[in-house]
Amino acid sequence: MELLTFRDVAIEFSPEEWKCLDPAQQNLYRDVMLENYRNLISLGVAISNPDLVIYLEQRKEPYKVKIHETVAKHPAVCSHFTQDFLPVQGIEDSFHKLILRRYEKCGHENLELRKSCKRKVQKGGYNEFNQCLSTIQSKIFQCNVHVKVFSTFSNSNQRRIRHTGEKHFKECGKSFQKFSDLTQHQGIHAGEKPYTCEECGKDFKWYLIFNEYEIIHTGEKPFTCEECGNIFTTSSNFAKHKVHTGEKSYKYEECGKAFNRSSTLTKHKRIHAEEKPFTCEECGKIITSSSNVAKHKKIHTGEKLYKCQECGKVFNRSTTLTKHNRIHTGEKPYTCEECGKAFSRSSVLNEHKRIHTGEKPYKCEQCGKAFRQSATLNKHKSIHTGEKPYTCEECGKAFSRFTTLNEHKRIHTGERPHKCEECGKAFGWSTDLNKHKIIHTGEKPYKCEECGKAFGWSAYLSKHKKIHTGEKPYRCEECGKAFLCSRALNKHKTIHTGEKPYECEECGKAFGWSTYLSKHKKIHTGEKPYRCEECGKAFRRSRVLNKYKTIHTGDKTPKCKGCGKAFKWSSYLNQHNKIYTGEKL
C-alpha cells in the first residue's frame, strides 16, 4: 500500500519549460495546482510542504519549490488509478474540446499520459476515496516541447460549489469558480495594481490586460485574420472581428435578432424596453447612451476643451483634435496598397478602396441605385421624398441637407474657406478645391473603359459614360428637355423661371448661375489668371486661352461639312454654317 501524495496529482516544470508557456497557460497551471491542493486537504491528506501553495497564491515561479518534497501524511487514503479512470479516448476527447477550442495549435497524437498512479490499495481506503470522488476532469497543458495531462479531483461538496457558485467574496458577495480569479478580484477592492509597464510606467490590475498592453510599444500585431489579412494587437479585438464568418453569438430572446457584439445587443434591448433614460434639458433630445450625454451637452454650452496649438482652433473631443492635427503635420498614415495613395483617416481609405473594387454597398430601396458612401445615399434619398427642410433666411431657397444650406450661404457672404496651397486660389467648397488640385498634379485616375479617356474626378467619368449610353436622366418638367447632369438641368430651369439670384455687388448685374458671376467679377478686378506659356498673353477664361493657343499651333480642327473649310474657333464655324441655313448673321 502506498500513500497518495501531492506529486501524484501534480506536474513539474523546469525553468526552461515554464518559459514555454504563455501567460494564459501559466494561469491555468496555478488554478489546477491550487484546486488539487484543496481537494487533497478536503480528503484529509495533509501537505508537509505548503511553500508551493504559497508560491502559487503569490503568483511566483513554481519551479523554485520541489514538488516531490510535498508528502501526504494520511495513511488511510491511497490511490489506485486504472485505465478505467483515465481512458485514452476520454483524454483525447477532452484534449479536442479544451485545447483545440482554446489554442487550436496541436493535435492529440503527441499526448503523453502520466501513468505513475497505478498502485495497490486497501479495500476500505479505496472505497472511502471512491465515495468522495465524483468526477475526474482532465486538465491539459500545451507547451512547444511536449504536452502533459493531469487530473484534478473534486468531492461532491466541491462540485456542488462549482455549479451553484458558492465561492463568495465577503466584501461584495461576488462569487468565483477559481481561486486565482478571487485573488485578482480582491485587488480591485484593495486598489492594487501589481503589473507595471516598464516602457511607460502604467499600472494594471489584470495580467492579461497588462500583457496585451505591452504589445502597443513593440508594434507587434500577432493576431491575423486568414480571410482578409487584417491584423490585431489583442485577442479580444480579433474575436470581435467576425465579418467573414457572419457569426452573431449575442442573441436577444425577445425578437430573435442576433448581434456580433454584446454592446450592440445592450443598445438593441433599449428599443424593446423603450429605455431612453437620458433626456437633454436644453433641447429635449433623447440619448440612449450615458457616455454620449456629456458630449451632447457641449453643443449647447459651446465648451471646447481641446485646442490646436498650431492654429488655435478648439474642439469638443480629443479624437477630433488628433484628426485635425494631421492637416498641419501632413501625416497620412493610411496607404492604399492598390495605387499607393495615402490618407489621413482610415475611414477615407476604406471608401477609396471601393474605387478599385467597384463595390457599392449602399443601395437605394426606392430606385435600386447603389453608392459607395452612405452619405451619398442619404443625399440621393431626398430626390424621391422631395423634402427640403433647410431654408436660407437671405433668399428663401430651400435645401434637403443642412450642409448644403451652409455651403449656399457662402454665396451671400462671399466666404471662400478652402485655399489651394500650391497657387493660393480660394474656393467656397472643398469639392471645388479637390477638383482644382488636379490641375497641379495632372492626376487622372478614372478611365473610361469604352474609349480610354481619363478623368481627374469620378463624377466627370460618370457624366462622360452617358455620352456612350445616350442616357439623359435629368428632364425638365416645363419643356421636357433632357440633360446628362443635374447641374445642366438647374441651369436650364433659370430660362423658364427667369431667376437670377447671383448679383454683382460692383455693378448690380444679376446672373442665374454662380460660375457666371465669378467670371463676371474678373471684369472689375482685371484678374486674368490664364496665361499663354508661348507669348505670355493673359485671359480671364480658360476656354478663351485654349482657343488662343491654336494661333501658335496652327491647329484648325473645326471644319465645315459642306465645303471643308477649317476654322480656329468653333464659334466661327457656327457663324459660317449660317450661310447654308440662310439664317441672318
UniProtKB/Swiss-Prot annotation:
Gene3D superfamilies xref list: 6.10.140.140, Classic Zinc Finger (3.30.160.60)
Matches recorded under CDD domains: KRAB_A-box
Entry's Gene Ontology cellular component terms: nucleus
InterPro entries: KRAB (IPR001909), KRAB_dom_sf (IPR036051), Znf_C2H2_sf (IPR036236), Znf_C2H2_type (IPR013087)
A single GO molecular function term of this UniProt record: zinc ion binding
GO terms (BP aspect): regulation of DNA-templated transcription
Subcellular location(s) of the protein: Nucleus
Residue intervals of every C2H2-type zinc finger in the record: 141-163, 167-189, 195-217, 223-244, 250-272, 278-300, 306-328, 334-356, 362-384, 390-412, 418-440, 446-468, 474-496, 502-524, 530-552, 558-580
Signal peptide (UniProt feature, chain positions): none
Keyword RNA-binding recorded: no
PROSITE patterns (alphabetical): KRAB, ZINC_FINGER_C2H2_1, ZINC_FINGER_C2H2_2
Keywords, alphabetical: DNA-binding, Metal-binding, Nucleus, Repeat, Transcription, Transcription regulation, Zinc, Zinc-finger
SMART domains associated with the record: KRAB, ZnF_C2H2
KRAB domain span: 4-75
Pfam families: KRAB (PF01352), zf-C2H2 (PF00096), zf-C2H2_6 (PF13912)
Family, similarity comment: Belongs to the krueppel C2H2-type zinc-finger protein family.
Physiological role: May be involved in transcriptional regulation.
PANTHER family (UniProt xref): C2H2-TYPE DOMAIN-CONTAINING PROTEIN-RELATED (PTHR23226:SF313), ZINC FINGER AND SCAN DOMAIN-CONTAINING (PTHR23226)
Name listed for the protein in its UniProt record: Zinc finger protein 732
Gene name in the database record: ZNF732
